[in-house]
Amino acid sequence: MNRRKIIAVLAITAGAALLATTATALSRGDDPAPAASGAAVVRSDVQRTISAAQDRLKRVPGDAATWAQLGSAYVEQARITGDPTYYAKAQGALDTSLQHKPESNGPAHLGLGALANARHDFAAARDQAELARDALPDTAEVYGVLADALTQLGEADEARAAVQRMLDLEPGVPAFTRAAYDFEQRGDVDAARQALTRALDASPSPADSLFCRYHLGELAFDNGDLDEAAAQYEQGLQIDPLDPALLQGRAKIAAARGDLADALTIYADLVTRVPSPQYLHENAVLLGVAGRTEDAARQFDLLAQQERLLAAAGSTDELATSIVAADRGDPTTALAAAEREWNRRQHPLVADALAWALHLAGRDAEAIGHADRAAATGWRNATFAFHRGMILRALGRTAEAADALGSALKTNPHFSPVDAPAARSALDGLR
């Protein structure tokens, strides 16, 4: 289960920090929210921010700053609820802010940048973040939105500079988590772990602690340490037993340890409460592994419905489309989507998806260049290594194929409930 959406999740931290500032400005008279559940605190904070902004705009309808705050809150609400209709509300509020203050409106451009990242329009996100930076050159959140966009566009050096600026301005959870992702993409797992640990130590709220525990668990899982991954997920679940991301981690551990029934029970609850494309996809794959093909097909149908809703709300995720199509045995759709995404951005995840789609289409001579490009950063990514190994095997480069497949299984023997067994079988055939 490739952690392909981590940067979208990382964007949450900058949004949460901005919303915390917003909530303080708008709701000074409110009682503090209870700290019993990290997710509940975030939901409560965002809803209070929205309500306070709406109340103020009834009194002062021309307040550009409050329109920007409302728009940013709607972006966060879309993430929390999984309801993409909030994107249009966010767009409207942020555009209204710019109508009232068209020049030097840093908060509106910052919100539009976060919105564009959420919609996977990373070029627009970069442009909006740069406008926000012009108005707010010493605001850390600006560099978080900019770093996310640059990372996804494949502009690694520029993204690293933005993260460093963020660290210089405000060395807290949003900066440390982005630094961790940068280290991970370069293959420095120890540095990534240290950065996430610093983020955890700096966490000012239960929600931030949950976030850090989840990503420490993901880092451990992606590098084959199931015990450490499970420990991180479970420590987070002690804070909030219903946190969806941490429950997804628990489900992955169960599947990796061979307890498909437990994993599917967890996913059944997850997709009912949070029917995100990621969870629907992962559930469908596991259902297929369990032999429940009709149930898997229904999950894929629900996934297609969710993707149509996202597209209607202005969100385009051709990378996810390609990955899902490949998993469903549709190389034509997988390749078309991967090519469209590659034309938009040259990120290693997109290079890998394009390589795999080309392989499935029987075009291995073209595929290997993209697989090599995905591997060139040094990222210890078992999926990258597996795809590259299978392409090399198809090209008859057996020694290199065996090395790549062995690397995939050494990095994470449980990287996929489908592809890890396929890697073992292919490797056995090469020996």
Model-derived features: positions:
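TPR-repeat structural position
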Residues: 46, 80, 87, 122, ...
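N-terminal leader/linker segments that initiate helical-solenoid repeat arrays
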Residues: 2-103, 107, 127, 413-414, ...
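Canonical tetratricopeptide repeat
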Residues: 69, 110-111, 145, 178-179, ...
